[in-house]
Structure formats: C-alpha cells, structure tokens
Amino acid sequence: MVEFRFDIKPLFAQPIIKVTSNLLPNTFRGDRRQCLDATSKMTEIIDQLGQLSATSQGLSKPVTTAQRLRMSDNQTIYLLADNEAGHNGAVLGLLKVGTKNLYLFDEAGKTRMVEQTPSILDFYVHESRQRAGLGKRLFQTMLNEEQWTARKCSVDRPSEKLLSFLSKHYGLKRIIPQANNFVLYEGFFNDGESGNGGGNGHANGTPNGLHITNSPNTHLFGATYLGEDSNQRRGSQQQTTPNARLQQITQISPSGRYGAKRPTCSMAEIIHAGNSKGGNGNGSAEANSGNGNHDIPEIAEQLQRQSLADLEANSYEPEPEVEPEPEPEPEPEPEPEVITPPSPPPKSHTPTPPSVRSPEVAESIVGDNRRAPAFQLSKQHTGMKNRSFGVGMAVMPSSKMEFDQMEREDFGVVKINRPPGHEVTSPGQDNTDAMSTVSSGGGGLTDQGYYDLKFYHNKLW
C-alpha cells in the first residue's frame, strides 16, 4: 500500500473514486480554495501510482501521469484506497481506461475501423495487496460505471499478470492477433453478446450491426455491416440487382469533394442519340428505354452511314485546273547594222540622249549573234558591279575582242574589234575610229559602240 504525508480521507469519500481531466474526485464538494488543495494532492497521488505501475511492468517511463490526464478528454482513472490503513490512509490500486479509434483485424483477418473502442490503458494493484480480490473489485466497478463488458474491451500492452487476471475472472483466453500493441479477445466483433447500451463497444453502431463512419468510402459505397450477419448480408447484396446498390448510394448524400457533380458519359449520349430518330431531337436515352437492348453493330453501322452522308453533302467537285498556254518564243531579231556616225572633234564630250542608243544594240555588238535578254539582267546575273553607277559595264571577253592600246590615245577609251594590223596613230591626228564620246545613258557605251573602261582606273574598283 502507498501512504502519503497528507490525509487522504477527505478525498476518498468511498473506497473507489473516479477522477477525470479536472483532477478532482467525482465525490468531492468544496470551495475554490479546497479545490486547489485537492487538485494538488490528487496530482501527487496519480503521479506516484503511475510511477509504481511503470516500475512493476518494467517500463522506462510512466504511462499514467496527472499532466496527461489533464490534457485528455476521454480518459478516466479509478483509484482504490483503504482509509483504515495507517494514520492517513493508503491508496491500493489504479485503473486507467479510455476510448480510442483503432484499425483492427477481425476473426477472418479483415481490417476494420472501429471508433470509440473501449480500452484498458493501465492497471495496477500494490504488491502487498494482490491476490486478495481487490483487483476484481476495482475492475468490476469500472465495467459497471462505463457500462462495458470485458470481452468488448481492448487492452493496451497487457502484462502477463493482467492476461492471467482476465483469463481467471472473465474467461478470456482466445486472443485475436493484431498488428498494433492492443489485445482483443474472440467475441469482440460479435454484437450478439452486447448486454446494454454501451456494452457493445461501438459507440457509433446500431443493434442491427450497421457501422457508419465519416470515411469517404461510407459516403460512396454505403454503410458497413459488422458481426456474424455480415456474410449473409454480403451474399444477399450480391444476388440483388445493382439498382439496390445505387439506391443505397443515393440515400447517403456525399459531402465535400465527393459531392461534386460528375460529367455524364459522352459515349452513352452519342450511342443513344444515334439510335433515336430525329423525332424528339434531344438525343437522350428516353427513346431506347423501352427495349433496353442495344445492337451495337447496327448502331455503329448507322453512325458510319450518317457520317458518310454528311461528308457527301459537304463535298464538292474541284474545278479542273487550266494549264497556262505557253508563251510563244520571240523570234530572234536580226542584228542591226552598226553605223558609225562621224565623230566629233577630239576632246569634245557632248552627252548623247538616252533615246539614241538602246541596250539591244549595245549587246548585239559584243559576242557572236547575241540576242537581247527577255528580262532586265541585274548585276547578280551579269557580274557588272558598277552598272548602277553609270560608269560602264564589265568587259565580256569574246573571240572578236582585242585590247590594242600601245599608246595613250584618250583617257579611258579602248577600241574594240580593231582590225588586225591597224597601227596606232598619234593623238594629234584626226582619228575618228579611236575617239569617242562617253554617253551618260546606254549602259556606259561610247558613241562608236565601245565600252568605256575608265572605271578601271578608279580606286574603288
């Protein structure tokens, strides 16, 4: 027995008291000052009994403390005391119980979510008073107060002494293995033995075994049936039509994101719209609800015919392309005779109008039987880089072109098609064959039909 330095008789009006999160006995009556005093004394009693229980079970730290009890709202501690022992009385035992939400395995090995499961969290009787019936007295008082049954209780990490106690006094021997530290006995999931309202251990259950939780699966697929009749209900549900399941789902209105509106099946609308003729024009399944049987090949063939008809209605014959008539090739113009006009006096540069000379005449002079181009040649085609500056065109060499300039006749003047053996005359003579006047037009040709090559003396060339 555990004795304290203060008198425990005012706290224990009866041998077994019940303490909740307020740390006051259920039989306590007093003012504010007495409440504070009683709270401090109950804190010391609970902490010392919890430490003795942890030492007896070989735990590193106590499971039961006054601070944990104050922070919880679903735990209760039952204390057993002897007011006649010693001078101030003595506390003999402790029993802590509560409710927990657990995932448990049933006899068939299926996982079940059980809410508000009755749990035995800590049980201790002083070694000097064991095997005297005090533990059975304390445990039975708890069952009567909580309206539980021993078979419906789960035990958290029971010791060998506690297992022997339950086997001796309540006949609990066959254990259902669990993945957690809790121990269940056979009959825990059997609702037939529930004695009273809270004895079944399922606060959210009903007498017919219907188990409803806040899980999304409950909103989507309906409630879960527990107990022995679960297999019978499962077999009967498989034999019923799917409409019963749909009716069960619609009865429980989903909430949250599970209650959002889902889009209808577009393929079903296409099939029903293809089957229904254009009488109603809504494309729904009302036209086909009478027979209920849809011939899929006929529907597919009908859709294919409809698509082909739409394509034929929208199709059109392309107009034949008209091939362009080939343009007649221009006949080659005869080369005009080159008439050399009388040259003006030397060193006279009189510009000739552009209408006097044409590019066709200039190009016919250079080369053998050259024809005028059908389009205007650019300097990318001809390589005549300085054509746009009007200083002359590039020299196009041919077999009839000679460069015989022994002496300086005039600046930038080269005679073309000079007959062989022709001697160069002096600048003082009247050489009409050698002198030419540069025309501003005509593509850089002189009046005699020569190419003005003075751009070769330019530094930028």
UniProtKB/Swiss-Prot annotation:
<dbReference type="Pfam" id="PF05301">
    <property type="entry name" value="Acetyltransf_16"/>
</dbReference>
<dbReference type="GO" id="GO:0048149">
    <property type="term" value="P:behavioral response to ethanol"/>
</dbReference>
<dbReference type="GO" id="GO:0019799">
    <property type="term" value="F:tubulin N-acetyltransferase activity"/>
</dbReference>
<dbReference type="GO" id="GO:0000226">
    <property type="term" value="P:microtubule cytoskeleton organization"/>
</dbReference>
<dbReference type="GO" id="GO:0005874">
    <property type="term" value="C:microtubule"/>
</dbReference>
<feature type="site" description="Crucial for catalytic activity">
    <location>
        <position position="57"/>
    </location>
</feature>
<feature type="compositionally biased region" description="Acidic residues">
    <location>
        <begin position="318"/>
        <end position="336"/>
    </location>
</feature>
<feature type="compositionally biased region" description="Polar residues">
    <location>
        <begin position="426"/>
        <end position="439"/>
    </location>
</feature>
<feature type="compositionally biased region" description="Pro residues">
    <location>
        <begin position="339"/>
        <end position="356"/>
    </location>
</feature>
<dbReference type="InterPro" id="IPR007965">
    <property type="entry name" value="GNAT_ATAT"/>
</dbReference>
<protein>
    <recommendedName>
        <fullName>Alpha-tubulin N-acetyltransferase 1</fullName>
        <ecNumber>2.3.1.108</ecNumber>
    </recommendedName>
</protein>
<feature type="domain" description="N-acetyltransferase">
    <location>
        <begin position="2"/>
        <end position="189"/>
    </location>
</feature>
<feature type="binding site">
    <location>
        <begin position="159"/>
        <end position="168"/>
    </location>
    <ligand>
        <name>acetyl-CoA</name>
    </ligand>
</feature>
<dbReference type="GO" id="GO:0048666">
    <property type="term" value="P:neuron development"/>
</dbReference>
<comment type="function">
    <text>Specifically acetylates 'Lys-40' in alpha-tubulin on the lumenal side of microtubules. Promotes microtubule destabilization and accelerates microtubule dynamics; this activity may be independent of acetylation activity. Acetylates alpha-tubulin with a slow enzymatic rate, due to a catalytic site that is not optimized for acetyl transfer. Enters the microtubule through each end and diffuses quickly throughout the lumen of microtubules.</text>
</comment>
<feature type="compositionally biased region" description="Low complexity">
    <location>
        <begin position="283"/>
        <end position="293"/>
    </location>
</feature>
<dbReference type="GO" id="GO:0070507">
    <property type="term" value="P:regulation of microtubule cytoskeleton organization"/>
</dbReference>
<feature type="binding site">
    <location>
        <begin position="123"/>
        <end position="136"/>
    </location>
    <ligand>
        <name>acetyl-CoA</name>
    </ligand>
</feature>
<keyword id="KW-0012">Acyltransferase</keyword>
<feature type="compositionally biased region" description="Polar residues">
    <location>
        <begin position="233"/>
        <end position="254"/>
    </location>
</feature>
<keyword id="KW-0808">Transferase</keyword>
<feature type="region of interest" description="Disordered">
    <location>
        <begin position="196"/>
        <end position="295"/>
    </location>
</feature>
<comment type="similarity">
    <text>Belongs to the acetyltransferase ATAT1 family.</text>
</comment>
<feature type="region of interest" description="Disordered">
    <location>
        <begin position="314"/>
        <end position="362"/>
    </location>
</feature>
<dbReference type="InterPro" id="IPR038746">
    <property type="entry name" value="Atat"/>
</dbReference>
<feature type="region of interest" description="Disordered">
    <location>
        <begin position="418"/>
        <end position="443"/>
    </location>
</feature>
